[in-house]
């Protein structure tokens, strides 16, 4: 009688699967390398370098009682929503620095906030694991909390949220390792996105009008590009050495940048399916918390944990400016919709408008 085969130990099968996946990964890298025929800085050699340019703080927005964690511009290029560790969400007029609305959330650490495309609502959330939408009205004295609508529920903290191209749907990312698309009206989940192995920290929607993709980054050091219709991860990039804190699409939608705790920002080309540039200097040793592109895509602004904002020439990979002003780490940064200025939020409790 044939000797009975020993049942495979769970540990053995796991080890073989891991080595198989590592082999497949290295094969993939080899295939990718075959298409890798030119570097971005070589292509950009003939392009004129940017000179040093001066940007100054034009406005300082004071009113939060604790660390500013997130901010977003309204499409009207004038209003800003910001959220803070003090549990407050404030809508500002960036021209006059006046506060137009303020909401106190039931929890502290409001890590995510977003303006609706119409400018008539804001969404926010954080340690309450929820994403809440507040409709804004012209009546400045109205109690916004009474009109609150809870849209999304995760099983861990909400790390980021953004509306799709309408007020009717909202994308969220969470510490539970997932992203999800929700219907604002009904609060139903329309699609969930599983693929990260740890907390998802950031997301950004593709800029095209038909924007059916978005990118997310997280504590698994991985950036994933997702198809919103199928819920599938269509591309993933793993080259950072630490958490990815921020991702932002290039204005054309063909690439995206990421900022990480490994003190680098990186540019990934979606068509070439690989990393094409690293923005780093030996003197920069603190993590990048947030990144955003200028309207032309030539500049990349990075907010860092050493209280500075570094401005990079995207094509040349060189730093063209360094901005001082904040007195604690820069936690969030967004370029205004018309590209004339950008706003940064910091753990020093303030927001600054630079131009």
From Swiss-Prot:
GO molecular function list: signaling receptor complex adaptor activity
GO cellular component, one term: heterotrimeric G-protein complex
Disulphide bridges: none
Keyword Repeat: yes
Coiled-coil stretches: none
Pfam families (alphabetical): WD40_Gbeta
Subcellular location: Membrane
Region called Disordered, residue ranges: 1-23
Major subcellular location class: membrane
A biological process from GO: G protein-coupled dopamine receptor signaling pathway
WD repeats: 63-102, 105-144, 153-194, 195-238, 239-278, 280-322, 325-355
Keywords, ordered alphabetically: Membrane, Repeat, Transducer, WD repeat
TM segment ranges: none
KO phenotype (gene knockout): No visible phenotype; due to the redundancy with gnb5b. Simultaneous knockout of gnb5a and gnb5b results in no striking dysmorphologic features, but the larvae show impaired swimming activity, remain small, and generally die 7-14 days post fertilization (dpf), most likely as a result of their inability to feed.
Entry superkingdom: Eukaryota
InterPro entries associated with the record: G-protein_beta_WD-40_rep, Gprotein_B, Guanine_nucleotide-bd_bsu, WD40/YVTN_repeat-like_dom_sf, WD40_repeat_CS, WD40_repeat_dom_sf, WD40_rpt
Role this protein plays: Enhances GTPase-activating protein (GAP) activity of regulator of G protein signaling (RGS) proteins, such as RGS7 and RGS9, hence involved in the termination of the signaling initiated by the G protein coupled receptors (GPCRs) by accelerating the GTP hydrolysis on the G-alpha subunits, thereby promoting their inactivation. Increases RGS7 GTPase-activating protein (GAP) activity, thereby regulating mood and cognition. Increases RGS9 GTPase-activating protein (GAP) activity, hence contributes to the deactivation of G protein signaling initiated by D(2) dopamine receptors.
Subunit structure: May interact with RGS9; this interaction stabilizes both proteins and increases RGS9 GTPase-activating protein (GAP) activity, hence accelerating the deactivation of D(2) dopamine receptor-mediated signaling.
Membership in a protein family: Belongs to the WD repeat G protein beta family.
UniProt cross-references to PANTHER family, sorted A to Z: GUANINE NUCLEOTIDE-BINDING PROTEIN BETA G PROTEIN BETA
Record's protein name: Guanine nucleotide-binding protein subunit beta-5a
Name of encoding gene: gnb5a
